[in-house]
Amino acid sequence: NTLDATSGDTTNMWIEKNTNRTPDKYETAWGQPVTKPELFKMFKEAGFNAIRLPVTWYPHMGSAFFKSSTSLTWSPTKQPLTGDVDPAWMKRVHEIVDYIISQDMYCVLNVHHDTGTSNAAWLIADGEKFEKNKALYTKLWTQIAEEFKDYGEKLIFESYNEMLDKYDSWCFASMNAPGGYSRTDANDAYNAINNYAQTFVDAVRATGGNNTNRNLVVTTYAACSGKANDNWSEHLNEPFTKFVIPTDTAVTDGKKHLILQIHYYQQNLENLESSKNHALATLTNLRSIFPSYKIPIIIGEWGSLN
């Protein structure tokens, strides 16, 4: 599903410039046809029981900034978002959620390419940016949560995708800092991640209904998977050790309604045995760190290539 197509990037700016900006223009921007119920029927018949539905929201949180743009790039600084989700976009997201739920599968609905390396990313793991965008982020999740507050446990909300620091650092915060790793900058990024996660939980729970106990997914910095058997940096586990599980009011029979997410990509395809050992070492590392958190872990993305 390409509800995560990022129209703020130069390659997709044609959506804003030359069309009526209907949901299908975004949905097909990366070459995929309009999503139909048959797609999820196929997944169900193939044995899948859960679908992650990635959605990028920023092109649909206020249209004035695109109409005023004269360049082929969008700047979240010069053309700020209003935060009001376009009803047509929310309706389309709702339709696809229903496609999934109707197959009796779990649906994980998220905020996707509002994060990442795109020039349009407005969710940045940075203390100053968090303070600036906290109200906007809260407003977005409040609207999503209100839209689906009566849905049952098959619908899960995911806070954000791969949120990066101001240096677009992967693997751990401040990896790409000019002059090398900065402890101050790294801590600022990790604190921002923790604040975003807590804000997400608070916003959803405040809407009531079934959101009071809905299962919620929070993600590590950049969705990092930590160290494996190639410990090339002492900072690889920081996205884990610096992560603080949000305070949450939802507890059933002593169990929290929170899930932690990481992503895992293995780039070495030349030696399958080495790739296998790397994956096993990653899982072993996860097991050694997270039992104390007492919440499940999911691998929301995985693959042999980026």
Model-predicted segments: where are they?
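Short intrinsically disordered, low-complexity coil segments enriched in acidic
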Residues: 1-8, 51, 297, 306
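Short, solvent-exposed beta-strand-terminating loops
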Residues: 1-13, 59-65
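Active-site loop signature of alpha/beta-hydrolase-fold enzymes
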Residues: 3, 58-60, 114, 165-166, ...
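Short, solvent-exposed loop/turn and secondary-structure capping segments
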Residues: 6-7, 63-65, 119-120, 168-170, ...
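A solvent-exposed, charged loop/short amphipathic helix patch at secondary-structure junctions
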Residues: 7-26, 69-80, 171-185
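A general, composition-driven signal for non-globular sequence regions
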Residues: 8-11, 15, 46, 106, ...
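Extracellular glycoside hydrolase catalytic/binding regions
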Residues: 21-24, 138-142, 146-154, 160-306
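An active-site-proximal structural segment forming one wall of the substrate-binding cleft
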Residues: 22-51, 55, 59-61, 65-159, ...
